[in-house]
Amino acid sequence: MLQTLQAFPNSKVLSKWLEVRGKRLENTSGTEASILNNPLTPNHSSLTTKSDEKPFPIEGEGLGRGSSFHLGMAGYTFNKFDIDTTLAFMRRIDVHYLCIKDFHLPLDADADQVAAFKAKLAEHNVVGYAVGPIYMKDVPAAEKAFAYAQRVGVDLVVGVPGSWGDKSPNYAVLDRVEQLVRETNIRYAIHLHGPDMSLYPDATSIWEDVKDRDPRLGICLDIGHDLRYGSDPMRDLKRYAKRVFDIHLKDVTAPTKEGKAIELGRGIIDFPLFVKLLRKVGYKGSVSLEYEKDMSDPFIGIAESVGYFKAVMQTAQ
């Protein structure tokens, strides 16, 4: 606990974090509570146990003063867990927006599978607000991704026009994506990956490729990766606000490739300033935690990060 307390230099944020954490534990019983208290708990199977409690209302997230955006989860966070575990844990931490990954709902899912998946989300009071990130190695892959988004019923695809190892964007794919955006009225946000990937390492590299295209092509601003590349995510949010359609929350230990993912509030990103800026630019999308530390046992870090960010949202003036 001492290490956690030292991560909060702002006493107002600390007190609000403790309040939020306390309320979550009051509503958490048995093994779920032990998981939140003990990061070494090896068995997460109880998270899939159906609870008798009613889902938390989406409107009751306590997002703070003047917020027009939603706190969500990037599905990649749960890449080692099934959708039942994911949704049960999201209920426990009172987060209700999910960017859907294809390991939870396959790209070739048919109408019946999509309907069953959406019913499961609704049971847990979770909204699937987007799909992705989806890598699009060629035009057929782009067409498949947009058909998938239509079946799921979302208005945003987070993607990359190319493959992980590509050195430059696939402009044939991007051209087709622009056509698909016009045909479907589904927006497209290119995800940046910092210094780990040649394609679109920061927000500016995306901006250069979308600025003269349909305004429904934009940016998924991963603030941790943007910073690790040496860019300034605060500056980029201000510069490109009208084209930022999705945001992935991360904190990191250094503004370099060697920077590692860490719980929100323990790294070098100024989250009170970030929240103030989100409000100033009028951002209206989702702000989704993509937690990439301890991905085989992430629950305590996710809970801490969500509690911290909610506290910042309630205290940032």
Protein language model features and the residues they cover:
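A structural motif corresponding to the C-terminal end of an alpha-helix
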Residues: 124, 180-185, 213, 274-284, ...
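Acidic/histidine-rich catalytic cores of soluble enzymes
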Residues: 182-272
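Distinct, well-ordered alpha-helical segments
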Residues: 83-87, 111-114, 140-146, 169-175, ...
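Arg/Gly-rich low-complexity intrinsically disordered repeat tracts
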Residues: 14-30, 34-47, 53-55
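N-terminal pre-domain/capping segments
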Residues: 1-17, 22, 49-52, 59, ...
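Active-site groove signature of glycoside hydrolases
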Residues: 149-168, 184-195, 288-289
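Hydrophobic faces of well-ordered beta-strands that scaffold small-molecule active sites
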Residues: 69-75, 98-100, 128-133, 157-159, ...
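Active-site beta-loop-alpha junctions enriched in small/polar residues
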Residues: 74-78, 101-105, 133-136, 161-164, ...
